[in-house]
Amino acid sequence: SVTALQEAAAVAGIVNGGVYHSPTIIKSAVDGHGEPSEIPKTTTRRVISQRASEEVRDMMENVVSTAKGRPIPDYRMGAKTGTAQRIDPECHCYHGYISSFIAVAPIEKPRILTYVVINQPTNGHTGTAVAQPAARQLMSVALPRYGVQPSTDKARKEPLEYQP
C-alpha cells in the first residue's frame, strides 16, 4: 500500500514530463533550541520518457473531456478515477469501498494536482460519483488562487483511440 502523498507524487512525476520530484511538505524547520534546521533537498529522477508522459496526459485528459459537466471552464484538465473494495480484517471479506479522484491542470503543463480519497463513502462508490466533485471544487479554487493561466489550446473533441 502507499500513502496519499506517495500516490500524488508518483502521478505528478508521470504527468510532469516523466520527471519525479521528491515531495516536500514543509517550508522551514527549527530544532529544540529555536535554531534553523536543514530541510533535505528535493531530488529528481526520470521515471518514464517524455513521450510516455505525453501519452498518459492525453489519456487522463480524455477522462475529463468526454464526461459531461466535469471540466472547469478555460482549463484543460486530466484525471484518473479510483474505486477499490475494502477488506474487512475480521472476516477477511470485502466490505465497503475506498473511492478516489486525482486531477491535474492545466494538462498541457501541469501546475496543480488534487487528490481526493473517500473512505467508506455513503453516497455511491465510484471515484467519479464520490470524490470527483470535491476534486473539481478544490481545483476551481486553486487554479486562479495560485495564478495559473487558463489553457490557450482547446481540448480535442474526439475520444482518444489506442494506437499500438
Residue ranges, per PLM feature:
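Active-site beta-strand/loop architecture of penicillin-binding DD-peptidases
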Residues: 1-43, 51, 60-149
